[in-house]
Amino acid sequence: MGERVCQRTATELSSYPTELEAHVTLTDQRRIRIRALHSREERPMRVLHARLSPRTRYLRFLSPIPTLPDALVRRLACVDYRRRLAVVAEDEAAGCAGVVALASFSAVDETTAEVAVVVQDDWQRQGVGTALVSTLLDAAEKRGFDRFVASIAADNWIIRRLLDRFGRVVTSHTSLGVSELVFVRR
């Protein structure tokens, strides 16, 4: 499925969204650069995943994944900038080697997108997640998505609070420690 899903036309691949690029000063005065993940750009995801604590990995993937399987990395890196988009935050001091967070959306249907976000532990609670989710949801809305779905650990109050800032939950279902949230932008 991974290879077939990632076959893109030249037009899709040439439509890299430079308008998503931004520089942000965080609450601790560190600076990040936000940009879209390039199609098939796998390395930042692997580097970021290796830097995450086991708890943060669990909260993101709802499973203790010590290393990202190749098939999952290929699927996550398969972006077309319309129905699948990912944005990363880079530590400006470290450049491209310093990816500290990633947020993504993937179309569920024509108006609904599934969203996910992860921030490296030592960069959490500084505004990185807020900046990335804001960029991601703005981009999704410009592409016609007005409803969002997120699967989160039921005890992940940090991401729940972050999503509450950006939207109003219209449905929520929790089972076996996982909450499925459907929300719309405020």
Ranges and model annotations:
Residues 2-186:
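Long, contiguous binding/interaction regions
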